[in-house]
């Protein structure tokens, strides 16, 4: 029984840690497609990731042959979506601000 409790506590700690510190994700553009960076520099991806509120910026990443996508470091999953990140930065986009 003690082993199950230890595993449960460790599991909760991992979830809490990832919620607080974010994770590494590929962000989605305005049309829910990934940002390609085949002809771009890491600076392009870094700017995109900062736009998506990534705390540590980003870089051009090659997850598969012939595919190069921006990858953001330390970003909340919700912020990987363009409009959600914009709503956090500009609350008036939600339409419920007086």
Curated annotation (Swiss-Prot):
UniProt GO cellular component terms: extracellular region
Tagged with keyword Disulfide bond: yes
Compartment(s) where it occurs, according to its Swiss-Prot or TrEMBL record: Secreted
GO molecular function: ion channel inhibitor activity; potassium channel regulator activity; sodium channel regulator activity; toxin activity
Disulfide pairings: 37-60, 45-70, 49-72
Residues covered by the LCN-type CS-alpha/beta domain: 23-91
Site feature: Important for blocking potassium channels: 44, 47
Keyword terms of this UniProt record: Disulfide bond, G-protein coupled receptor impairing toxin, Ion channel impairing toxin, Neurotoxin, Potassium channel impairing toxin, Secreted, Signal, Toxin, Voltage-gated potassium channel impairing toxin, Voltage-gated sodium channel impairing toxin
Tissue distribution of the protein: Expressed by the venom gland.
Signal sequence range: 1-22
Major site of localization recorded for this protein: secreted
Family of this protein: Belongs to the long (3 C-C) scorpion toxin superfamily.
Function: The homodimer inhibits HMG-CoA reductase (HMGCR) (32% of inhibition produced by 0.6 uM), a glycoprotein involved in the control of cholesterol biosynthesis. The inhibitory effects of bumarsin are seen at much lower concentrations (0.6 uM) than that for statins such as atorvastatin (5 mM) and simvastatin (10 uM). In addition to inhibition of HMG-CoA reductase, this protein lowers cholesterol levels by inducing steroid hormone synthesis via StAR, and by increasing reverse cholesterol transport mediated by the induction of ABCA1 and APOA1. The heterodimer non-edited LVP1 induces lipolysis in rat adipocytes. Induction of lipolysis by LVP1 appears to be mediated through the beta-2 adrenergic receptor pathway (ADRB2).
Domain notes: Has the structural arrangement of an alpha-helix connected to antiparallel beta-sheets by disulfide bonds (CS-alpha/beta).
UniProt subunit comment: Homodimer; disulfide-linked or monomer (edited version) or heterodimer of an alpha chain (AC B8XH01) and this beta chain (non-edited version).
UniProt-recorded name of the protein: Lipolysis-activating peptide 1-beta chain
Source species of the chain: Buthus israelis
Lineage per the UniProt record: Eukaryota, Metazoa, Ecdysozoa, Arthropoda, Chelicerata
């Amino acid at each position: 029984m003690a082993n199950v409790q230890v595993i449960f506590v460790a599991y909760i700690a991992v979830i809490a840690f990832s919620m607080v510190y974010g994770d590494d994700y590929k962000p989605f553009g305005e049309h829910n497609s990934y940002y390609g960076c085949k002809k771009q520099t890491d600076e392009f991806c870094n700017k995109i990731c900062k736009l998506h509120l990534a705390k540590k910026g980003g870089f051009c990443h090659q997850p598969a042959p012939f595919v190069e996508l921006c990858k953001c470091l330390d970003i909340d999953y919700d912020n990987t979506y363009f409009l959600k990140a914009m709503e956090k930065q500009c609350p008036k986009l939600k339409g419920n601000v007086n």
